Amino acid sequence: MSEASDASATGELRLEPVQFIARTDAVMRLGSMMLGAGGSSARVRDSMERAAHALGIDELHTRVGMTDIVATTSRGPLFRTRVTEVRRPAVDADRLTALKRLTNDLRPGMTTVELQRALDAIAARPRRYPELLRLLGAAFACGAFALLGNG
């Protein structure tokens, strides 16, 4: 007997709020992408709130750190707490702008699939500049800042 049919036989699928979990995961993915692109904690929190509202989540409580997000979502009697870590945060203004535009366009009734597709499209966009050029630009900016500070 397969795992899926085992779950059906015991009624486990009825107990597991699959759609609610998918909504929570989509909200967390948006927050993680924003934090990973250099978004401020206030901007990340605001964008996650907008997404949660658009997807039909009643309440969202978040704690956004420098490299992690802890969020608890609730809808009726259901709740779910998720933790995500951004391992390599960087500043990517282009991605941040695309994510902010997406959150500004969110409307109540949006589906999880629609949000995930929009996030997939943003994630698939190539970076505007190659890594070597970004590295050289950062080195130049740091050097210029040191000169301005009499360093």
What are the residue ranges of the model-derived segments?
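Short, well-structured alpha-helical segments that form the helix of a local strand-helix-strand
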Residues: R45-S47, Q116-L119
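Soluble N-terminal domains of membrane-associated systems
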Residues: M1-M110
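Core alpha-helical transmembrane segments of integral membrane proteins
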Residues: R128-G151
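Short coil/turn segments at secondary-structure boundaries
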Residues: L115-Q116, L135
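Cytosolic juxtamembrane amphipathic/interface segments immediately preceding
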Residues: A118-R127
